[in-house]
């Protein structure tokens, strides 16, 4: 049996906190059409992401990728920013 890896999820968001060492909090927003009311709904979620170089500050747009657990709450890595 071959070892086939699933592609990792990639999300784009905005850094809302960079106070912790080597960690940034990224807010990811998504829009979807409500199935009953047919209205577009905007939902946001916060992710703790690993920033090993403390390179990103609040307001930066970044991409995060899924990874192995780094700590209790961190399972995402910052891959690049604008």
From Swiss-Prot:
Protein keywords: Ribonucleoprotein, Ribosomal protein, RNA-binding, rRNA-binding
GO MF assignments: rRNA binding; structural constituent of ribosome
Q: Which domain of life is it from?
A: Bacteria
- InterPro entries associated with the record: NA-bd_OB-fold (IPR012340), Ribosomal_uS17 (IPR000266), Ribosomal_uS17_bact/chlr (IPR019984), Ribosomal_uS17_CS (IPR019979)
Q: Name one GO biological process term.
A: translation
Q: Which GO terms describe its cellular component?
A: cytosolic small ribosomal subunit
The UniProt similarity line reads: Belongs to the universal ribosomal protein uS17 family.
Q: Which HAMAP family match?
A: Ribosomal_uS17_B
Record NCBIfam families: PRK05610.1, uS17_bact
Give the function comment from the record.
Answer: One of the primary rRNA binding proteins, it binds specifically to the 5'-end of 16S ribosomal RNA.
Q: How does it assemble?
A: Part of the 30S ribosomal subunit.
Instruction: From the Swiss-Prot or TrEMBL record, give the protein name.
Output: Small ribosomal subunit protein uS17
Organism this protein belongs to: Rickettsia felis (strain ATCC VR-1525 / URRWXCal2) (Rickettsia azadi)
Gene name, per UniProt, is: rpsQ
């Amino acid at each position: 049996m071959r070892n086939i890896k699933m592609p990792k999820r990639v999300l784009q968001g905005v850094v809302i906190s960079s106070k912790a060492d080597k960690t940034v909090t990224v807010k990811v927003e998504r829009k979807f059409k409500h199935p009953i009311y047919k209205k577009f709904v905007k939902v946001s979620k916060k992710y703790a992401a690993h920033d090993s170089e403390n390179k990103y500050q609040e307001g930066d747009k970044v991409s995060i990728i899924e990874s192995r657990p780094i700590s209790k709450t961190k399972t995402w890595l910052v891959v690049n920013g604008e």
